[in-house]
């Protein structure tokens, strides 16, 4: 008898989709940006764009350990990220419109570009939803490779902030309320500094949520 299959419906930044697809022991069913109407996609990233949860400084290798912390610097960084989103929307809308503003409406050269291409310009700012299914062995491998490694004063590593705090406070069965009360600020830079995991930070954030 095989392992019980475990399914998770997860929403995460589109930028880490390719990394998730490398996990062959898990089957994936993903929403496609090509199937979503262009105007709906534009509205989505205007109202709920993906913005990085933290901003690593330039580094060598696969994973950095230093983060931008200055408030003014962070504000400028986020503002520029959103300007890049706005520029992507503007260019995608030009392609989708067939350049009506520049060509006469009676001009037979007006041809609108397919949404399958226009939506591609918006993907860095998109979220995607995926149904992920696999046996316990597949999930164990996923957690081993992708979960954070929060190091505590004891030297022991934990796969989630909840586990680390529960061990520190002697809580044997922490629930969701414990999570919310114990680290309300998900973006506290000290957690990133304590994390010695080597996966991309948004990949680790997703793995941590599923682990919890």
Residue ranges, per PLM feature:
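A conserved ligand/cofactor-binding region detector
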Residues: 1-212
């Amino acid at each position: 008898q095989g392992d019980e299959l475990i399914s998770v419906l997860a929403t995460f930044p589109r930028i880490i989709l390719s990394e998730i697809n490398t996990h062959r022991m898990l089957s994936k069913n993903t929403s496609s940006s090509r199937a979503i109407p262009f105007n709906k996609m534009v509205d989505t990233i205007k109202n709920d764009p993906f913005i990085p949860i933290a901003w690593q400084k330039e580094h060598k290798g696969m994973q950095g350990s230093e983060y931008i912390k200055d408030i003014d610097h962070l504000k400028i960084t986020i503002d520029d990220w959103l300007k890049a989103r706005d520029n992507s929307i503007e260019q995608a809308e030009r392609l989708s419109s067939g350049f009506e503003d520049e060509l006469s409406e009676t001009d037979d050269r007006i041809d609108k570009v397919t949404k399958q291409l226009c939506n591609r310009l918006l993907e860095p700012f998109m979220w995607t939803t995926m149904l992920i299914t696999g046996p316990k062995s597949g999930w164990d491998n996923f957690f081993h490779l992708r979960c954070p490694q929060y190091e505590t004063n004891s030297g022991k590593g934990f796969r989630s902030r909840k586990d680390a705090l529960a061990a520190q406070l002697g809580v044997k069965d922490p629930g969701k309320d414990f999570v919310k009360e114990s680290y309300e600020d998900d973006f506290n830079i000290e957690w990133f500094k304590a994390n010695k995991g080597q996966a991309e930070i948004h990949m680790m954030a997703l793995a941590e949520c599923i682990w919890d």
